Amino acid sequence: MPICDPSSSSTGAGSTKLWIIHGVAVVAAAALALGAHYYMFYRRSGEFRSRVVGIIPARFASSRFEGKPLVNILGKPMIQRTWERAKMATSLDHIVVATDDEKIADCCRGFGADVVMTSDLCRNGTERCNEALSKLDKRYDVVVNIQGDEPLIEPEIIDGIVKALQAAPDAVFSTAVTSLKPEDARDPNRVKCVVDNHGYAIYFSRGLIPFNKSGNVNPQFPYLLHLGIQSYDTKFLNIYPELPPTPLQLEEDLEQLKVLENGYKMKIVPMQVIKVEHEAHGVEVPEDVDKIENYMRERNLH
């Protein structure tokens, strides 16, 4: 129904109704303009998405590597090494470990970390971050999901994805990629990513993407490896658990595909991807522990 009907009378109840509707439209427009003014003010003043918490989700019952957060890496539990690296990031106002396991909680409290106990019903790290966020006393604008199996995570990567999200008001999710090593091309535990010309994620896969018709790895192509860290706008994080699981997410067992497949990238809020130069050293399976310890010894990292 149009706001202004040419056949409407200019007097009486019809006129009153017309002016009320017109008044509502004017007030709504003014509210939008005022909101935009404050939005731009916060962007310029550096207060947009300014309160940031880092959450390290950790569970004991991993199907591929049970007890992984507590595995010893050169004298320290892996979860402690991840926490110590995260503490070096300048963008985080607070860091907590989110877990459903008392052994992990006791270990983390022992080296000084704040711990939030979460349900054992969380289906992935993102849902665990959301539950932990709801239990924190302070309110935050951005949550950084720091994977507990990245004991050598670079603080610059954490700061980089936070800045990417702060600089992209149309995005609700940011993550990072790096160059894929040829030897990791066929490894399903190394998640690959393809990105559009504007720096937004197109797809993630455990298989090699893109895949050429020869079936061989092209040594000239810049394949990308997804790093196990991501940040979310907290408003989006609150609705993430309510998004229905998707076929691609379930087939690949990759939670970020639920965001893309539910249409956020294409229609409303794309997933921002930043590329960083980083030699990834995540621990997915027990065999990775020796690799990372050798890497640390070679570079005198303790």
Regions found by a protein language model. Give the residues of each.
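N-terminal glycine-rich phosphate-binding loop and ensuing alpha1 helix
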Residues: 45-98
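Short phosphate-binding loop-to-helix
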Residues: 96, 102-163
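Terminal signal-anchor or tail-anchor transmembrane helices
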Residues: 4-44
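Hydrophobic/aromatic residues located in beta-strands of well-ordered beta-sheets
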Residues: 54, 95-97, 143, 174, ...
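Short, high-confidence coil segments that cap the C-terminus of an alpha-helix
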Residues: 92, 138-140, 168-171, 264
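Conserved alpha/beta core of the MobA/IspD/sugar-nucleotide pyrophosphorylase nucleotidyltransferase superfamily
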Residues: 138, 218-302
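Conserved core of the sugar-phosphate nucleotidyltransferase
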Residues: 153-246
